[in-house]
UniProtKB/Swiss-Prot annotation:
Family annotation (SUPFAM superfamilies): PurM C-terminal domain-like, PurM N-terminal domain-like
NCBIfam families (alphabetical): PRK00943.1 (NF002098), selD (TIGR00476)
Cofactor detail note: Binds 1 Mg(2+) ion per monomer.
UniProt-annotated binding residues for ATP: 19, 46-48, 66, 89, 135-137
Ranges in coiled-coil conformation: none
Top-level taxonomy: Bacteria, Bacillati, Bacillota, Clostridia, Thermoanaerobacterales
Gene3D superfamilies the UniProt entry points to: PurM-like C-terminal domain, PurM-like, N-terminal domain
Record flagged with keyword Transferase: yes
Record carries keyword DNA-binding: no
Catalyzed reactions: hydrogenselenide + ATP + H2O = selenophosphate + AMP + phosphate + 2 H(+)
Chain segments annotated as transmembrane: none
Gene that this sequence comes from: selD
Protein name per the record: Selenide, water dikinase
Length: 344
């Protein structure tokens, strides 16, 4: 039965493209009263990747939750991708994951399929050096899976998205194009080589990238997921009080993604991201499929790291030596200008 199941056919939208758009989400969150505590080091105020709560002078808890609908048809791969995506928030904060809880919404008729999803998630968490400690399930006709992840970090070594500094160099650790490729997968229009490459990109942990950036020392970091490169860069720029400038020609793309974008296989999340970022992003170059892919919602995307120019060469060299998909210098941090983001 497992071989006959195509998980993506159960869903309306795939992966992080299924997120509520940033514009709608902002309208909800702005009405919430933000409660604060001196030990809550990172909360709702900066749209960061995870919450951080200080327990004592040496330990802070980093906590996040992330789950979504299937992005691929193979249940084991889906489990691995969902786990890698959830763990990424902890890595972006410079923390070490300790344990995770499964979050499951699944049709009861496909328990054998669910077993494979959970096996994939468990294997990826094990690869991260963490543990699955339990979870929660809901019966649902549209499958969803992910994790609630808890990690730790020294309170003075938290890497936030709100501390980028003018003069910093921006380095991205995975190529873009996942949202477009996932749309092609769901429509059964994705070439097999592009499909297989995208699966490998999504399954790849940001663990080594996080370890290297901690050793080198960086100013800020965020992971690139549902709001796309430009959406998450906007959160970094706005929270840091700076402007970010991207070089369009330096943007890395998964092989085959550009061609799929040219075919018009653009996910709805891309258009939601564009709408939200209107007036915040200034495109100074021809708007083509590369620009679409900069708005494209990613699933288990890479880290966007803001590092001082003095340390950028070392970080770039070490990341490229270690990471499976390399690292790419994609832009710079500038003093605050009229727009939060420029693409040149």
């Amino acid at each position: 039965m497992i071989e006959k199941i195509k998980l993506t056919q159960f869903t309306k939208s795939a992966g992080u493209a299924a997120k509520i758009g940033p514009e709608a989400l902002a309208q909800v969150l702005c009405q919430l009263e933000i409660t604060w505590n001196e030990n809550l080091l990172v909360g709702l105020n900066t749209n960061d990747d995870a919450a951080v709560y200080r327990l004592n002078e040496d330990i802070a808890i980093v906590h996040t939750v992330d789950y979504f609908t299937p992005v691929v048809d193979d249940p084991y791969d889906f489990g691995q991708i969902a786990a890698a995506n959830a763990l990424s928030d902890v890595y972006a904060m410079g923390a070490v994951p300790l344990f995770a809880l499964n979050v499951v919404c699944f049709p009861a008729a496909y328990i054998d399929v669910l077993k494979e999803v959970l096996r994939g998630g468990n294997d990826k968490v094990k690869e991260a050096g963490a543990l699955i400690a339990g979870g929660h399930t809901i019966e649902d006709e549209e499958p969803k899976y992910g994790l609630s992840v808890t990690g730790i970090v020294h309170p003075e070594k938290v890497i936030k998205n709100s501390t980028a500094k003018p003069g910093d160099v921006l380095i991205l650790t995975k190529p873009l194009g996942i949202g477009v490729i996932n749309t092609a997968i769901k429509g059964e229009m994705c070439p097999s080589e592009t499909y297989l490459l995208a699966v490998e990109v999504m399954k790849y942990l940001n663990k080594e990238a996080s370890e290297i950036m901690k050793e080198v020392g960086v100013n800020a970091c965020t992971d690139i997921t549902g709001f796309g490169l430009l959406g998450h860069a906007y959160e970094m720029a706005f929270s840091s009080g700076v402007t970010i400038e991207f070089d369009k020609d330096s943007i890395p793309l998964i092989e085959g993604a550009r061609e799929l974008a040219q075919m018009g296989l653009i996910p709805g999340g891309c258009y939601r991201n564009k709408k939200y970022l209107k007036g915040k992003v200034c495109i100074k170059v021809e708007e083509d499929e590369v620009i679409d892919l900069m708005f494209d919602p990613q699933t288990s995307g890479g880290l966007l790291i803001s590092v001082s120019e003095e340390k950028a060469e070392e970080l770039y060299r070490r990341l490229n030596k270690k990471l499976k998909f390399g690292a790419f210098i994609v832009g710079r941090v500038k003093e605050k200008q009229e727009y939060d983001i420029y693409v040149r």
